[in-house]
């Protein structure tokens, strides 16, 4: 590239970062103005936006069931609306964070251990999400956790530090910047092992399976790669759309942000919670309007069409999708994705980020050390997953399953995922875990032999 070309490229990148700064500043200004408005005036604007939306897009008005799901306050309400009960648990990590944990089971009389008689499965959510993201589907048949509960698995929904259900620390308030001083390393080293240890302590099993989505999947990879005790406790791992190595950046603005120096990202987003504004607008905007804004944002910045997710499903899901995390986690994820290596957090303040520096080599998570059955499920149109790059890093005993025409969010929200994604998850877990176990409990619980054979052969 010529000198003029390099200068032009440099100017474009800096210009795009400047535009990002301006957009963030503009959003902050609107948010502050909205906060200081009197409550009656905010309610008036809310009602007016609802009327305008209803007039121009009446065909997209949500039905009563969707309204109830949209208005659900938490994971407990969402599960109840779908006919399931939920137990709340709390896990204390060794560095002082209190993590909310949700155990899902059928609304039937009897002990949980009798209803959920198969080994436990832990679900790990993605970036800026919480446990609600797994159960905010329009139909219960489209929620992966519910499908596993119906199979008899002991299902647990995790909540990582900083989100809606894990906003406590024994030393620091969430208003203290020290509360938010954690990267993905802290989650991999403290949160996931603590959650797994707790789950195994409250039931009779000595092993567990993991299901992670997006960033949740890469966190599971990281935790398993460095913790021998954790590896010995995990029977199988299903990674849904692990966002380690994006296939491509859909827009120059996103590319410029991801490739920006870490200190510049801190200057843009601060050092506390990441994009708390998303949670704010989610609370003050009419849900269909908020869903439209999110949809436009995802289309513009990430080129996600969302064509496999119905408009009503988007309205419900986007009302529960976002939660808090630290800016440091986002910066860490940006370091991982731009280098396409699952590495530890780079503390170097150097202007030009590099996997190798003059002084040190950033530590990489040795995921090739993981020796357990791993299934990677991803969409063919998912621009957050470069499967060819991932294949070079995946450990033995791994298999990759591609879902045609699926994008990133389709894996957990797609309209057709019941017959595609859920089927794959259930089959993989049944194949790896349930074979020997079904035989061992057949007599103890009086299970019908024909039923057991049907489940194992995937004929029922």
Swiss-Prot record:
From the record, give the transmembrane residue ranges: 17-37
As for membrane topology, the entry says:
Single-pass type II membrane protein
Enzyme type, top EC level: hydrolase
Quote the subcellular location field of this record.
Answer: Golgi apparatus; Membrane
Which residues does the Swiss-Prot or TrEMBL record annotate as the active site? 214, 382, 408
Which Gene Ontology biological process is one annotated for this entry?
ergosterol metabolic process
**Job of this protein:** Probable lipase.
Similarity comment:
Belongs to the AB hydrolase superfamily. Lipase family.
Protein name, as recorded: Probable lipase C14C8.15
């Amino acid at each position: 590239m010529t000198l003029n070309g390099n200068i032009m490229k440099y100017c474009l990148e800096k210009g795009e970062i400047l535009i990002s700064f301006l957009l963030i500043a503009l959003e902050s200004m609107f948010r502050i103005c909205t906060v200081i408005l009197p409550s009656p005036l905010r309610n008036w604007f809310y009602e007016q936006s609802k009327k305008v939306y209803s007039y121009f897009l009446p065909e997209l008005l949500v039905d009563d069931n969707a309204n109830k799901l949209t208005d659900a306050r938490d994971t407990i309400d969402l599960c109840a609306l779908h006919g399931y009960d939920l137990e709340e648990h709390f896990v204390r990590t060794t560095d002082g964070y209190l993590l909310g944990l949700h155990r899902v089971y059928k609304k039937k009389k009897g002990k949980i251990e009798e209803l959920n008689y198969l080994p436990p499965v832990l679900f790990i959510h993605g970036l800026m999400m919480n446990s609600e993201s797994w159960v905010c589907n329009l139909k219960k048949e489209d929620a992966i956790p519910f499908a596993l509960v119906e199979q008899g698995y002991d299902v647990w929904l995790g909540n990582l530090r900083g989100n809606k259900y894990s906003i406590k620390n024994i030393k620091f308030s969430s208003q203290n910047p020290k509360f938010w001083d954690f990267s993905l390393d802290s989650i991999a080293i403290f949160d996931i092992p603590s959650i797994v240890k707790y789950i195994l302590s409250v039931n009779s099993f000595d092993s567990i399976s993991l299901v992670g989505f997006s960033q949740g999947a890469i966190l599971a990879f990281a935790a398993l790669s460095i913790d021998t005790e954790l590896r010995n406790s995990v029977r199988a791992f299903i990674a849904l759309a692990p966002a380690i190595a994006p296939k491509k950046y859909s827009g120059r603005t996103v590319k410029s942000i991801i490739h920006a120096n870490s200190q510049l990202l801190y200057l843009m987003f601060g050092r506390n919670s990441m994009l708390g504004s998303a949670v704010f607008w989610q609370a003050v905007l009419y849900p269909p309007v908020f869903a439209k804004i999110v949809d436009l944002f995802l289309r513009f910045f990430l080129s996600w069409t969302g064509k496999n997710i119905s408009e009503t499903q988007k309205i419900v899901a986007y009302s529960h999708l976002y939660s808090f995390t630290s800016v440091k986690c986002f910066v860490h994820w940006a370091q991982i994705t731009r280098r396409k290596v699952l590495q530890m957090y780079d503390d170097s303040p150097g202007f030009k980020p590099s996997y190798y520096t003059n002084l040190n080599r950033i530590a990489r998570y040795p995921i090739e050390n993981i020796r357990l059955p791993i299934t990677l499920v991803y969409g063919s149109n998912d621009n957050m997953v470069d499967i060819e790059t991932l294949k070079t890093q995946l450990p033995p005993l791994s298999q990759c399953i591609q879902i045609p025409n699926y994008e990133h969010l389709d894996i957990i929200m797609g309209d057709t995922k019941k017959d595609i994604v859920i089927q794959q998850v259930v089959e993989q877990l049944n194949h790896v875990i349930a074979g020997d176990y079904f035989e061992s409990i057949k007599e103890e619980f009086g299970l019908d032999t024909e039923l057991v054979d049907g489940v194992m052969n995937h004929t029922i």
